[in-house]
């Protein structure tokens, strides 16, 4: 069946099937008084002026249309919440003080271990639907709140169930998220490499393997061992790095051939060069910097140096309980100094590339899956400018409306 989306005030899209870098990241195809033709869930054509005939039609009412957003870094499967930590943060308590009071990541680990798979699935499904309503049509979800095999498997089974129901969900094994309480650090790294990664791979539960390479967590050497072990078992490397301090994570990501390196709040010139030379996508997480009142990172410098940049929510219960990728886009423009055109590419094409889905998602081009959003905005600048409310008027996946305000 053919469906035409017509009366599009502005159609804005990145182009291509690989991450855009440098000047290309800020170069969009922009059409006015436009239409888009979808056939059997796939984009067939687009243009300006009089739309073609079709079996069905959608009046976009002169509004902005973009590709569906791709959130390439989330921690969506978790037990409990941590709102009780807010007062401690406002009182100036450090992370270590919050941890000592029974909070922090290890409190989420306890809650996640205690939750049933079905309870986690229902909670995660609800969060996914909220993200979908804000324009996110594909995403990545990490484990990392188990820190032992049974719970890591449980988290990744939840991700698999979500993928089976909705499609376009990438799974990342993040057993190297933190060290379990009372565990010898070297022994845990060995456990990850020799037992947990092989078991996760045998179950076919993860597309990617990630580690938190930073001060006080996993060293550069430990992170590299974990990522290489994952790579041997078919998991594509990703990395959390330079959120707290530079300890060589960007260089690790380049050496192991990581698809992305994320956070990067403290990355300097040498790290930027390593990312560029290694062909690694830099993922900015500005909503995390906003919530933690931490540096946003030199993503302007990264784009100018030719590093492809993606943007994601980092949705998690501790450092950014935010489901809205459009909010992260606005923060990325205001504090990461990206242009609206660059941030749209970051949230669509480059986000898709960071989870290996750019061949089918991330742009409104013929042959791509018809995932698109009609925004309650007249143009791209207005979408970024009018932050603070959900401006996704209608969300379509494979050409079918899945959510919207009307």
For every predicted segment, state its role.
Residues 4, 55-59, 171, 395:
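Conserved beta-strand scaffold positions in the cores of enzyme catalytic domains, especially
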Residues 8, 36, 41, 62, ...:
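Divalent metal-coordination and catalytic microenvironments
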Residues 60-123:
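Metal-associated gating/positioning segment near the N- to mid-region
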Residues 236, 246-363, 375-381, 387-389, ...:
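Active-site-adjacent C-terminal substructures of enzyme catalytic domains
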Residues 108-125, 137-247:
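Metal-coordinating catalytic core of metallo-dependent amide/deamination hydrolases
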Residues 392-406:
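Short peripheral tails and domain-boundary helices/loops at the edges of structured domains
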Residues 131, 199-200, 226, 230, ...:
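Generic structural signal for hydrophobic
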Residues 1-51, 380-382:
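N-terminal metal-binding scaffold of metallo-dependent hydrolase/deaminase domains
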């Amino acid at each position: 069946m053919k469906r035409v989306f017509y009366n599009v005030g502005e159609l804005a899209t990145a182009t291509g099937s690989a991450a855009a870098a440098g000047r290309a990241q800020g170069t969009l195809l922009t059409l006015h008084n436009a239409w888009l033709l979808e056939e059997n869930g796939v984009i067939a054509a687009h243009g300006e002026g009089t739309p073609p005939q079709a079996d069905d039609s959608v009046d976009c009412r002169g509004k902005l249309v973009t590709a569906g957003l791709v959130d390439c870094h989330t921690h969506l499967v978790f037990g409990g919440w941590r709102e009780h930590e807010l007062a401690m943060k406002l009182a100036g308590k450090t992370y270590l003080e919050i941890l000592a009071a029974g909070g922090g990541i290890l409190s989420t680990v306890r809650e996640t271990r205690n939750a049933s798979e079905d309870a986690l699935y229902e909670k995660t499904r609800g969060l996914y639907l909220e993200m979908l309503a804000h324009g996110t049509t594909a995403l990545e979800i990490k484990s990392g709140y188990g820190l032992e095999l049974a719970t890591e498997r449980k988290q990744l089974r939840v991700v698999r169930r979500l993928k089976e129901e909705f499609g376009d969900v990438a799974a990342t094994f993040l057993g190297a998220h933190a060290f379990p309480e009372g565990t010898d650090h070297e022994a845990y790294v060995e456990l990850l490499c020799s037992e947990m990664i092989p078991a996760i791979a045998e179950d076919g539960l993860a597309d990617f393997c990630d580690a938190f390479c930073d001060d006080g967590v996993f060293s550069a050497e430990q992170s590299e061992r974990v990522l290489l072990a994952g790579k041997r078992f078919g998991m594509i490397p990703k990395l959390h790095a330079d959120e707290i301090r530079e300890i060589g994570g960007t260089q690790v990501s380049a050496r192991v051939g990581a698809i992305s390196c994320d956070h990067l709040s403290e990355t300097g010139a040498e790290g930027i060069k390593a990312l560029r030379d290694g062909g690694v996508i830099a993922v900015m997480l500005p909503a995390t910097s906003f919530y933690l009142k931490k540096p946003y990172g030199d993503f302007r410098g990264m784009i100018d140096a030719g590093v492809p940049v993606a943007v994601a929510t980092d949705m998690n219960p501790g450092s950014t309980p935010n489901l809205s990728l459009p909010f992260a886009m606005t923060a990325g423009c205001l504090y990461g100094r990206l242009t609206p055109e660059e941030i749209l590419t970051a949230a669509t094409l480059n986000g898709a590339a960071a989870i290996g889905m750019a061949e089918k998602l991330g742009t409104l081009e013929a042959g791509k899956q018809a995932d698109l959003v009609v925004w309650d905005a007249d143009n791209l600048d207005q979408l970024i400018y009018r932050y603070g409310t959900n401006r996704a008027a209608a969300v379509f996946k494979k050409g079918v409306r899945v959510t919207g305000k009307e």
